[in-house]
UniProtKB/Swiss-Prot annotation:
Encoding gene, per UniProt annotation: polX
NCBIfam families reported in the protein's UniProt record: PRK08609.1
Protein name: DNA polymerase/3'-5' exonuclease PolX
Cofactors named for this entry: Mn(2+); Mg(2+)
Gene3D superfamilies: 5' to 3' exonuclease, C-terminal subdomain, Beta Polymerase, domain 2, DNA polymerase beta, N-terminal domain-like, DNA polymerase, thumb domain, Metal-dependent hydrolases
Protein family: In the N-terminal section; belongs to the DNA polymerase type-X family.
Residues annotated to bind Mn(2+) 3: 410, 437, 465
CDD domains associated with the record: NT_POLXc, PHP_PolX
Cofactor binding summary note: Probably binds 2 divalent metal cations per N-terminal polymerase domain. Mn(2+) is more effective than Mg(2+) for DNA polymerase activity. Probably binds 3 Mn(2+) ions per C-terminal exonuclease domain. Mg(2+) cannot replace Mn(2+) for 3'-5' exonuclease activity.
SMART domains listed in its UniProt record: HhH1, POLIIIAc, POLXc
Amino acid sequence: MHKKDIIRLLETIAVYMELKGDNPFKVSAFRKAAAALEQDDRSLSEMDDMMSLSGIGKGTYSVIKEYIDEGKSSTLESLQKEVPEGLVPLLKLPGLGGKKIAKLYKELGVHDAESLKEACEQQKVQGLAGFGKKSEEKILQALGEAGKQPERFPIGYALRIAREIEEHLSQFTHIIKFSRAGSLRRARETVKDLDYIIATDHPAEVREQLLELPNIKSVIASGDTKVSVILSFEYETSVDFRLVTEEQFPTTLHHFTGSKDHNIKMRQIAKERGERISEYGVETVETGEIKTFPSEREFYAHFGLPLIPPEIRESGQEVETYSDSIELIELGQIKGDLHMHSTWSDGAFSIREMAEACIKKGYQYMAITDHSQYLKVANGLTAERLKQQAKEIDALNAEFENFRILKGVEMDILPDGTLDYDDDVLAEMDIVIASIHSSFNQPEHVIMKRLETALTNKHVDIIAHPTGRLIGRRAGYEIDIDQLIELARKTNTALELNANPARLDLRTEHLMKANEQGVTLVINTDAHNIEMLDDMKTGVTAARKGWTETKNVLNARSLKDVEAFLKRND
């Protein structure tokens, strides 16, 4: 448990109280307590005096203490019994907060999406104070869009489901090995369904275990070589499991990894040699003999090719253009993480705790880059607080051996095109990240002018999540990617691949362009808690898909080389 868990609890209780129609002062008390914790620079393990914080009283403290001691909240459980379950999902609808939903519940008897839709269709909602005809129309539109089964899932959702499935597979008996296949193995940013290849000598036993997986809504197929199920999570998710022998595993894995175009190209090569590729192996057409391979590497070697990384198996052209001389970045080459947050802004853990987690990963360095003063919602740091934070970092650096914490900041590029700090403040930083968090709807030329201001400032080292997109949720702001890459090249400023699975920004095609131009890239997690540091794996996979070579990745370099880059404009 960390501080963010408690903040979420307090905010959730406030929302439920609002839905119930409780006294606004009680609602406010829980929101104030959440804000008090958010604004305190310490992590949960460092706080032994919560009652001394302005905003936390006896009532809210007793709720916090129960949650810490017992891992549950009787206050929240009681509220959940009193508030209709169907009201909570309505909070996801744009324009509907707790107060408005409480009004709909109290005055119209709205208790779920269906009853809200009915009230709107009967034009009852527009008659309530605080609503109108346009509000009613927007609610109906939002209800129509909510809960729709997307054709393809964002990779972040697919990864969550995959990890849950793999946790079960790793505990099954009679499985020799298993692997993801399909578009998830190729690291596509959206995924239609999940595919697994399982090597086993006991397919019947494995099949029975697969049919006992939790969350199965329906079974589509259940044979000795294939089990297909629909799993019910946030969305209904189709999963195919293919059961093969160990010797068939490499060619089956290759076949079902795809892509279609990659497989077509490989089949053409085989045909020219008088061979035929199938999921079972490589058949010599003349004799009917089928050859299998110990691994995909030997499969490709059979055709005189290097092992082509699954992430780049897309157009088929990679069969001709990829060679062993291309050194795509690997997770083990990452030496540090240069974008993360602590309790000084909106992170869940202290600088020490984040540093200790990075040391456990074997990193040589990290950068603490809390939000700047403009982002008040994230408890952004004033220039004075940056100075105070620097003292804490200095003390930790004096304590740690063979590890360096870089003093940094994630500075907002403001809507008017100026930067959130003056140059004299930035000059004191080891590393400066610049990013856009506001006014996404500005026209392209205005956005580009904002980015240019940052890129041409000699103190700015990195542009974070350069397009602002969220996969499947937000397209991001309008930018000229070619101009951005050229500016980054000219100013020798690094562009970030934000490894958060919801972002993966820069995207694949942008990474390809940046790599072609030799732009310095940096793979950062933007971690707001210790668990998010693990997103580096997803980021590296996304970087590989964009043909990112080790030589172009800033945080694959030694501390000495990183420091040289950061001082390039001195």
